Design a protein with these regions (language model features):
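Enzymes that bind and transform nitrogen-containing heteroaromatic metabolites
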Residues: 22-221
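Low-acidity, Ser/Thr- and Arg-rich intrinsically disordered low-complexity segments
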Residues: 2-4, 9-11, 20
């Protein structure tokens, strides 16, 4: 007669196996859900508006506080190369114009990012800015109409840059995806990722980028 495990205890191998099965199922479920979303978007013939920024553990964004690792910077280069364009508020656009001019201290990857950024069409939402750089257009009036037309006429992914602009577009129901690049840093103060009330969201995927950054991808619920 063979011995059996005591009542109330499972065999030592059952828990790891069960955990592996659950993790595998979750990964498969996320992959299927993401694939379905991609098929719908591909068939819609409309651009996808994406808001992504680096964020601290306590919810703040500050481009001066997050020096990207080599892996993360390469990721941003690939993102910029693949995007159909970017929509900026005035202040964020002025910050990003740093990439319009070459700098002698740049390495090859910084040159690669600058090239990708310059090649992108850019739309600057501002009633006051009259000076814009190459490959950029002003959006001065009717933000909702302009962005809806932009999404209808373009294919691919269009980046939204800056939490204030993202707040306005969120309130209009125009952002299709939110990407939070979560860093193991606590700032204690600053500009929050969500400049207004957080909209209802559904988590779609999580990715680890490099050693210490987790990307959380959400869509409107």
């Amino acid at each position: 007669m063979s011995e059996s495990a005591p009542v109330g205890r499972s065999c030592p191998t059952q828990k790891p196996i069960a955990t592996s099965v659950i993790l595998a199922y979750n990964r498969l479920h996320n992959a299927i859900r993401t694939a379905r979303m991609c098929r719908v978007r591909k068939g819609s013939g409309m651009a996808k508006l994406v808001f992504g920024m680096n964020q601290s553990l306590d919810g703040y964004v500050d481009h001066m506080a997050f020096a990207p690792s080599t892996t993360l910077f390469r990721h941003f280069i690939e993102e910029a190369q693949g995007q159909a364009g970017s929509v900026y508020g005035r202040r964020m656009y002025e910050v990003m114009r740093y990439w319009d001019d070459d700098h002698p201290e740049w390495d090859a990857e910084e040159h690669a990012f600058a090239t990708a950024w310059r090649n992108q069409p850019k739309w600057v939402v501002s009633r006051w800015s009259k000076s814009i750089g190459p490959n950029a257009s002003l959006v001065e009036d009717d933000l909702e109409g302009a962005i809806r037309e932009l999404k209808a006429k373009r294919d691919g992914e269009i980046e939204v840059a800056g939490p204030d602009l993202a707040r306005s577009l969120t309130e209009l129901g125009l952002i299709d995806e939110y990407r939070i690049y979560l860093h193991p840093v606590v700032l204690g103060h600053g500009k929050p990722y969500f400049a207004g009330p957080r909209p209802p969201l559904r988590l779609m995927t999580t990715d680890r980028i490099g050693e210490d950054v987790i990307r959380l991808t959400y869509v409107p619920a």
